[in-house]
Amino acid sequence: MSLQLLNPKAESLRRDAALKVNVTSAEGLQSVLETNLGPKGTLKMLVDGAGNIKLTKDGKVLLTEMQIQSPTAVLIARAAAAQDEITGDGTTTVVCLVGELLRQAHRFIQEGVHPRIITDGFEIARKESMKFLDEFKISKTNLSNDREFLLQVARSSLLTKVDADLTEVLTPIVTDAVLSVYDAQADNLDLHMVEIMQMQHLSPKDTTFIKGLVLDHGGRHPDMPTRVKNAYVLILNVSLEYEKTEVNSGFFYSSADQRDKLAASERKFVDAKLKKIIDLKNEVCGMDPDKGFVIINQKGIDPMSLDVFAKHNILALRRAKRRNMERLQLVTGGEAQNSVEDLSPQILGFSGLVYQETIGEEKFTYVTENTDPKSCTILIKGSTHYALAQTKDAVRDGLRAVANVLKDKNIIPGAGAFYIALSRYLRSANMNKLGAKGKTKTGIEAFAEALLVIPKTLVKNSGFDPLDVLAMVEDELDDAQDSDETRYVGVDLNIGDSCDPTIEGIWDSYRVLRNAITGATGIASNLLLCDELLRAGRSTLKETPQ
């Protein structure tokens, strides 16, 4: 009881009790999330303290927004949420694998096997899994020209987040968005150049893809044009309003004339800037009524300046978001200016159509019909906040799924095919050659059995019997082994049978599986080797003297 001598208020759990807490917590978290897994998974309703509702089946959203008390469950939740940050998917998979690895290991520990021996087996199995993954993957080249295949990848990801009807709407939107910002020559892809804009209007099925930019504000003057064709776009980061001096100073006047002169001199600074902008507009547009001029400024524009722009038929937007300034340059081809001293036609962008749309009290400005834009917008629509949030989460995961394939140049057949094939491989492999001797084999056995939790859960969530469906899959794999042919066999969740995911167009991300297996094995091993739980941290509250 050395801990009690050091800290009388400390609480501890030793060996069996600590392991039981860890296993129970992991299984509890698994039982909450496993019903979400796959395209047939169920939704969870999250209600916060203010009564706001969120419907989701996204594991990352659940783990980050649920209130979790158990320290073990918090550890697993944080690690699984980190998986989503890195790869964009696989959160529920990690939680299910950790829970099942601990459950299978606990069975052997109760029979007298030491946790260290099991974790050694886990590590051998993990290394073999990575080798098997590299053999199982299908390499793809020239993906930017294979839109049909990328549509299948996006559909596979989106089906696990939203219903089938909405998936068919979002699949081409997500694929086209990634392709529009992907630079195949430099193999460069920046998903930050895809703007996701929410509009509380219509339904999620009215979500659209804009090959351009949508700004969530409009012109601030009633006389400004709301639709500009063949628009020259000036991107500015210049204050077009009167600013106070940097040093504290005062100006005093003794008559109305002096006040008018003072006001006029204050305006001179801004008027000089306006004159240079209007001169540039006259130079590029002249008297041609088919040409327009648009100013998008990151800083403010005062009412008098707006009035001047309106008189010259210029659409001016003020206080644009900083993140949109870079996107505007990629969309229109213009260059952002920090001053009006060196304005020339070469720094202007061009857009075929800039128009304004008003929904309720909100204004949106569309910058469209551009030549080869390198930034785009996905306009998410929905009648409620939770519908918008659910669609936005699905779109983000879909974007990451397509981006992962373009970056990896590899893909894994889905529908649980990889987990079933890897489990068979580990069970049939010569464990002595793998370096597993004696009781270490129990770790590999536990690992192989735990892998089947993913296909079993997929089938169970579809309403079929997991044992029956997996038996059919095993039979088909046995037939393929007898005839020495390579066959990918997964589970068909629509009819409860086996299927070939490469024919059905069901795919998993290479990097998601790689990170999920590595992450789950690491978490499970650490929790198995934890033989004592201490609640002995310093209190943040100062203790009152006795």
Swiss-Prot record:
| Pfam families for this protein | Cpn60_TCP1
Q: Which residues carry this modification: N-acetylserine?
A: S2
Major place of localization?
cytoplasm
Family, according to the entry, reads as follows: Belongs to the TCP-1 chaperonin family.
PANTHER family recorded? CHAPERONIN
How does the record describe its quaternary structure? Answer: Heterooligomeric complex of about 850 to 900 kDa that forms two stacked rings, 12 to 16 nm in diameter.
Q: What is this protein called?
A: T-complex protein 1 subunit zeta
- Gene, per the UniProt record: CCT6
